[in-house]
Amino acid sequence: MLKKLALATALLAGVGTAHAYQAELNVGYENTDIDNVGDLDTFFINGKYYLNTVQVKNSPLAEAAFLNKASNIGLGYANASGDGDEDIDVFGVSGEFYIPNTQFYVSGTINQVDFAGDDNTGYALEVGYLPVTGLLLAVGAANESVDPVQVANYGFTANLSNALTVGDDTALSLRAKYVTQIGNHFTNFEGLTYIGDETTYRLAADLYIDPTLSVGLSIADSTADGSDTLFGIKAQKFFTPTIAAGVNYHTTDGIDSFGINGTFRF
C-alpha cells in the first residue's frame, strides 16, 4: 500500500513539473507599409537558454521565466529589407542574471547592425532591483543599441526609432515591469524610456484572459521635433504549454505594420 502511495505521489509530482522548460525559440515576420516609400519586410529569430529549468506554475505562461527569476543567455538575428537593394541585418548576444539569494538583477546586450557596407556596434547594460514579487525596477545605459530581441518584442520601427532619436551619445535607460493579479486575471505593466539627445518612452499593458491567452496595448513617442505617437495592439495564445502564436499591429502617421510570431519551448 505504501509503495502504491509513493508511486502515485511521484506521478502527481511529475504532472506538476511536466510543463517545465529550459530553452525558448521565437520566430516571426513583420510587414511595415510606409506611405510614399514602400514596404519593409522584417524577419527575426532569437533564442534563450535558461541556466535552470523554468517551472510553469499557476501564472501566465508568457511570464513564467520572469516570475521564476530565470537567468538566461540568448542569441538573436533580424533582417529588414525594403524596395531598395540594401538589407539591414542585426545580430545580438544578450544575458539576464538574477543574483542568487538577493533581489538584484543585471542584464546586458551587445549587437551589430550591418547596412550598406557599414557595421555599427551597439550595447545596452542594466542593473535592477525587485522590491516585491513580480516587480522589476532597472536603470542602465545604452549606445546605438538595436536589440534583435526587442525587435521581436516591440517591432522593428519602434526599436530603430529609439536608436536614431537618442543619437550617438550614450543614453540613460529607465525600465519597470510589474506582473500582478487584479481580481481573477493577471496583468503585466511595462514602461521604458531612453534619455539622450532626445527622450523616448514606451508604455504597455497586457491582460491575461487566462494563463494561455493575452491581449495588450502599447504607446510610444519621443521629444524629437515632428515625432508622432506610435500605437500598438497585440495578442498571444499558447495552444500547448510549449507552443504559442501571436499577432501584433502598430500604427503612426504614415506608417502601419502587421506582424505574426511563434514561440517554441523545450
Question: Across the structure, where does each feature detected by a protein language model lie?
Answer:
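Outer-membrane beta-barrel "beta-signal"
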Residues: 40-54, 174, 237, 255-266
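Repeated loop/turn-to-beta-strand initiation elements of outer-membrane beta-barrel proteins
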Residues: 23-25, 54-57, 101-106, 133-139, ...
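Membrane-embedded beta-strands of outer-membrane beta-barrel proteins
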Residues: 25-27, 45-47, 93-95, 125-127, ...
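Solvent-exposed loop/turn segments connecting transmembrane beta-strands
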Residues: 31-42, 78-91, 111-123, 143-147, ...
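Residue-level signature of outer-membrane beta-barrel architecture
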Residues: 31, 49, 97-99, 129-131, ...
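Cleavable N-terminal export/targeting peptides
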Residues: 1-24, 36-39, 55-59, 67-70
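Glycine- and aromatic-enriched membrane insertion/assembly motifs of diderm outer-membrane
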Residues: 40-62, 66-68, 93, 97-98, ...
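Solvent-exposed loop segments that connect transmembrane elements
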Residues: 146-167
